[in-house]
From Swiss-Prot:
<protein>
    <recommendedName>
        <fullName>Peptidase B</fullName>
        <ecNumber>3.4.11.23</ecNumber>
    </recommendedName>
</protein>
<keyword id="KW-0464">Manganese</keyword>
<dbReference type="GO" id="GO:0030145">
    <property type="term" value="F:manganese ion binding"/>
</dbReference>
<comment type="subunit">
    <text>Homohexamer.</text>
</comment>
<feature type="active site">
    <location>
        <position position="207"/>
    </location>
</feature>
<feature type="binding site">
    <location>
        <position position="218"/>
    </location>
    <ligand>
        <name>Mn(2+) 2</name>
    </ligand>
</feature>
<keyword id="KW-0378">Hydrolase</keyword>
<dbReference type="GO" id="GO:0006508">
    <property type="term" value="P:proteolysis"/>
</dbReference>
<dbReference type="InterPro" id="IPR008330">
    <property type="entry name" value="Pept_M17_PepB"/>
</dbReference>
<keyword id="KW-0963">Cytoplasm</keyword>
<dbReference type="Pfam" id="PF00883">
    <property type="entry name" value="Peptidase_M17"/>
</dbReference>
<feature type="active site">
    <location>
        <position position="281"/>
    </location>
</feature>
<keyword id="KW-0645">Protease</keyword>
<keyword id="KW-0479">Metal-binding</keyword>
<feature type="binding site">
    <location>
        <position position="195"/>
    </location>
    <ligand>
        <name>Mn(2+) 2</name>
    </ligand>
</feature>
<feature type="binding site">
    <location>
        <position position="279"/>
    </location>
    <ligand>
        <name>Mn(2+) 1</name>
    </ligand>
</feature>
<feature type="binding site">
    <location>
        <position position="200"/>
    </location>
    <ligand>
        <name>Mn(2+) 2</name>
    </ligand>
</feature>
Length: 429
């Protein structure tokens, strides 16, 4: 079969020889995607996956019906980690073309950096690459610093340093300031905090190989939240925002974090380490303390934080946890408007009491049988957010990465959540 093909949309059923309710049929002029209803974006994305699997390397979206959202759905399904495919389409209206190109630029960056190997993206490289991406979009409005290695201790960022001290690759914290106001004293509207664990072996609480194989993607929260800020900037976002990425590699060595160690955080909280594989919350705590120091109206953190969230929701939804019910409802509405899957998991005050330690203020994991891991992880983070009951959203990113392909997604990073977070920023401003 040719590696180039025109692709058409139709709401008419395929001819019988293609099978009952066939999604795709082929003819001399190209392939036709048969939709059960107009604007069936899921079907378009599934059809794009089928075309990729059949070796079609260039698709021209021809005929009627290809608007912004249908082109986007096709692009999402057609793209794979090897970036072998090219999509071409007829010109859209100017505003729609700008929006489509912005989506592609932001999500491609997110998917690419998550798909890179841990050898390519060490903690300092992640911080640098994220900063350079955002600065490329608004060079006159972005400044940043990267705090690394022993400087983390000097400035009080004990969690990031402790998690990464077992690796030969130094840990880093990105502190990026996007300030389009022209006023260096302008208030910070929002702080965006990302977990940036560039590889997670589990530390001494070692992961089995089948659980470790995808852990280059444990920085997916940083990738997602950086991409979202980039998309918001390209959409014209004009409020001051700080991006904080907490970057480390969780490895085993004679210097690595051990069970029973106690971390003393900048806000005075002490944490006993009862599981070194619950490291994401340890680095995020530093980022949330820094975010709280900025006194923003809004704090959003993103992290591939718990297996519990993925067990609950699979790879198809991101999890949302927040004490702010009104803000949560607005976030869920934003996700729906962007056609991205988000589901709220419970977070209550009693979850904060499920992290007892005999030697510190908190344990880094909850105790007991059948504890709600995603909820207690979010509750742990709340101890590092000033005024945690209002203006804070925590995303446990279950849908950033897929170890194997599905009918809608190639294996690897998805870019899901970038549009949703960008919309939340725009709507809250």
């Amino acid at each position: 079969m040719s590696t180039q093909m025109s692709v058409f949309l139709s709401t008419q059923a395929a001819q019988p020889q293609w099978g009952e309710k066939a999604l795709i049929s082929f003819a001399e002029q190209g392939a036709t995607i048969h939709l059960q209803q107009t604007q069936d974006f899921s079907a378009i994305q599934r059809a794009a996956r089928k075309l990729d699997n059949q070796g079609i390397r260039t698709a021209f979206l021809a005929g009627e019906g290809w608007d912004l959202e249908s082109i986007w759905a096709f692009y999402q399904g057609y793209r794979d980690a090897k970036k072998r495919n090219t999509v071409e389409w007829k010109a859209l209206a100017a505003a729609e073309q700008v929006e489509l190109e912005a989506r592609i630029k932001a999500t491609d960056w997110t998917r690419d950096i998550i798909n890179k190997s841990a050898e390519e993206v060490a903690p300092r490289q992640l911080a640098t690459m994220a900063a350079e991406f955002i600065k490329s979009l608004a060079p006159d409005h972005v400044s940043y610093r990267i705090v690394k290695d022993k400087d983390l201790l000097t400035e009080g960022w004990e969690g990031i340093y402790a998690v990464g001290r077992g690796s030969e690759r130094t840990s880093a914290m990105l502190q990026l300031d996007y300030n389009p106001t022209g006023d260096e004293n302008a208030p910070v509207f929002a702080c965006l905090v990302g977990k940036g664990i560039t590889f997670d072996s589990g530390g001494y609480s070692l992961k089995p190989s089948n659980m470790m194989s995808a852990m280059k993607a444990d920085m997916g929260g940083s990738g997602m939240i950086t991409g979202a800020l980039g998309l918001a900037i390209m959409r014209g976002f004009n409020k001051r925002v700080k991006l904080i990425l907490c970057c480390a590699e969780n490895m085993v060595s004679g210097r690595a974090l051990k069970l029973g160690d106690i971390i003393t955080y900048k806000n005075g909280k002490t944490v006993e380490i009862m599981n070194t594989d619950a490291e994401g919350r340890l680095v995020l705590a530093d980022g949330l303390i820094y975010a709280s120091e900025q006194k923003p109206q809004l704090i959003i953190d993103c992290a591939t934080l718990t297996g519990a969230a993925k067990n609950a929701l699979g790879n198809d939804y991101h999890a949302l946890l927040s004490y702010d019910e009104s803000l949560s409802q607005q976030a869920l509405a934003a996700a729906k408007e962007e056609n991205e899957a988000l589901w709220a998991l419970p977070l209550a005050e009693f979850h904060r009491e499920m992290l007892p330690s005999n030697f510190a203020d908190l344990s880094n994991i909850s105790n007991g049988d059948y504890t709600p891991g995603a909820s207690t992880a979010a509750a742990f983070l709340s101890y590092f957010v000033e005024g945690y009951q209002k203006g804070w959203l925590h995303f446990d990113c279950s849908a950033t990465y897929r170890k194997s392909a599905s009918d809608k997604w190639a294996a690897g990073a998805t870019g899901m959540g970038v549009k949703m977070l960008a919309r939340i920023l725009m709507q809250q401003a």
